[in-house]
Amino acid sequence: MLNHGIFTFSNDAKESYDLMIKYVSDAEKAIKKLKRRKIKQIKNLNTKITPAQIAPILRGLTSNSTKSKFILTFRNNKILKYFIDGKEVSRYSTEGTATPDHVIRVKPFPLIIKPKPRSSISEFEKTAKKAFINYRKKYLHYFEQNQKKVKEKKTILDTSPRVIIVQNICLLYTSDAADE
């Protein structure tokens, strides 16, 4: 549970503290043994599309399913580019949530848009629309499956993504509040 820590319990404080030291030390040793895996990258798509061109399209598609008007925050740096341009981004970007807040704030999976090489902006818009339709269906299915697991009725708030990965271009975070 990222940023939530670990918990150790015992009948006395000293024993609980010693268990904490042991488990943290064990985790450090395990992490050191892990091999860094290289992420195989997609080929450069030679796209001339920029984040500034796609932002209005994505904002419109995001706000389509709700009364809220979403704010898009553009994110891009060397590490993020490496992450979003991985051939298996669809797999590793959905390998579980880091915290309960993660599920609440960013939903269980991102929207991944894979533009075709040398797409025009109108071709990108068609690709994005299809991706949004599929995302909303997938999210609705996820919500309905999880609703079956609980007794109390839940209300779906909206089906729009919070994280949008546009391969070879950028990552965007969507929110209806500027401070999120």
Residue spans of the language-model regions?
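Divalent metal-coordination and catalytic microenvironments
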Residues: 4, 104, 169
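Contiguous mid-protein beta-loop-alpha structural module that forms a pocket-lining wall or clamp
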Residues: 1-38
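A structural signal for short secondary-structure junctions
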Residues: 96-98, 155-159, 164-167
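Hard-cation-handling environments
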Residues: 31-119
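Non-transmembrane, aqueous-exposed alpha-helical and coiled segments at domain scale
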Residues: 147-150, 156-158, 170
